């Protein structure tokens, strides 16, 4: 989706992905485009590009619980080594850098909704901690490059994106519920389903990411003291260089999401209640005040409409066999 929108803007796009959790079918329609190139590559390795680079967007990482629990060490390596390599490329090219972070940096929050100023409630040694801490470290390194090297950096904290091109088996609640409903299988609800989530449709999320990416820098000229760059505005609360929440503040319970999916699919699937995973967050809702103030951005697509569009996609992707 992001590559599509960048190409529509007239950008040249070089996409690097090792496809550990990705699907090449999501970009197959772009492979013949004159301004698009794809290289299968692991960002944890040395990253070098011959041509000039205007922006480096670092989205590499397993991102669903199913994936980062299957690849815990690689998830940590991407957050550390991958972020370092991507930042190094941006610095070498004098490029703008954007880090895709996550609402998981807030852990199982004790504050709801979560503003960017909230430091989170994270268990660093839990199974989920590999993703939480990988992204927290990536944010710290990104801010260090901004403060020390003067790199123009951006950080977006993404809250639960969904929509077409999701993997049917990615383990996320929306795709899991939809596929189960289409197949007439029970919808597996963790716990009693009272835990809440806030889901943002992919088109809205991409619009927010691009608004952050193309927003002018508010950093004043650098003043160097010894080995440290000091910026008058570097730590201002509403600096574009500080993390920005992107998500839909429309908070729903998991049970309500199941109901919406059943209605959208016309399925009669029953609900099956299973134990909640360790450190599964009880609430999740973004405070998007900073995005509204700085970018004039807010999501437009409702959860119900987004789920209908996603059902249409997954119905085609999964295939007609054994579907209700």
Task: State where each predicted segment sits.
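N-terminal Rossmann-like NAD(P)+-binding domain of SDR-like oxidoreductases, especially those catalyzing
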Residues: 1-161, 181, 213, 283, ...
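C-terminal substrate-binding subdomain of Rossmann-fold SDR/epimerase-dehydratase oxidoreductases
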Residues: 41-42, 85, 160, 181-324
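Residue-level signature of the cytosolic catalytic core of signaling kinases
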Residues: 32, 126, 166-170, 250, ...
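Short, conserved catalytic or interaction motifs in soluble domains
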Residues: 21, 164, 248
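Amphipathic alpha-helical segments in well-structured domains
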Residues: 83, 174-175
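Residues that form or flank phosphate/diphosphate-binding pockets in enzymes
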Residues: 22, 47, 168, 252-256, ...
């Amino acid at each position: 989706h992001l590559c599509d929108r960048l190409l529509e803007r007239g950008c040249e796009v070089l996409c690097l992905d090792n496809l550990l959790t990705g699907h090449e079918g999501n970009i197959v329609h772009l492979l013949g485009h004159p301004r698009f190139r794809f290289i299968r590559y692991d960002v944890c390795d040395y990253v070098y590009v011959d041509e000039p680079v205007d922006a480096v967007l670092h989205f590499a990482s397993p991102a669903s619980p199913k994936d980062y629990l299957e690849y815990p060490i690689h998830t940590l390596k991407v957050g550390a080594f991958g972020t370092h390599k991507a930042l190094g490329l941006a610095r070498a090219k004098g490029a703008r850098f954007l880090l895709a972070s996550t609402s998981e940096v807030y852990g199982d929050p004790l504050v709801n909704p979560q503003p960017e100023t909230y430091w989170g409630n994270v268990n660093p040694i839990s199974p989920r901690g590999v993703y939480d801490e990988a992204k927290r470290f990536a944010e710290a390194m990104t801010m260090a490059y901004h403060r020390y090297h003067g790199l123009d950096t951006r950080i977006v904290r993404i809250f639960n994106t969904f929509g077409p091109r999701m993997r049917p088996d990615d383990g996320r609640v929306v795709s899991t519920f939809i596929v189960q409903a289409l197949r007439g299988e029970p919808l597996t609800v963790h716990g009693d389903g009272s835990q809440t989530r806030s889901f943002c449709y992919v088109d809205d999320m991409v619009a927010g990411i691009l608004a952050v990416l193309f927003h002018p820098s508010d950093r004043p000229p650098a003043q160097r003291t010894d080995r440290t760059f000091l910026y008058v505005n570097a730590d201002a609360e509403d600096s574009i260089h500080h993390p920005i929440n992107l998500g839909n503040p429309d908070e729903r319970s998991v049970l309500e999401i199941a109901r919406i999916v059943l209605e959208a699919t016309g399925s009669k699937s029953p609900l099956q209640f299973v134990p909640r995973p360790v450190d599964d967050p009880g609430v999740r809702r973004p405070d998007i005040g900073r995005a509204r103030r700085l970018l004039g951005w807010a999501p437009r697509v409702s959860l119900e409409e987004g789920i209908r569009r996603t059902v249409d996609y997954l119905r085609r992707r999964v295939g007609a066999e054994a579907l209700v």
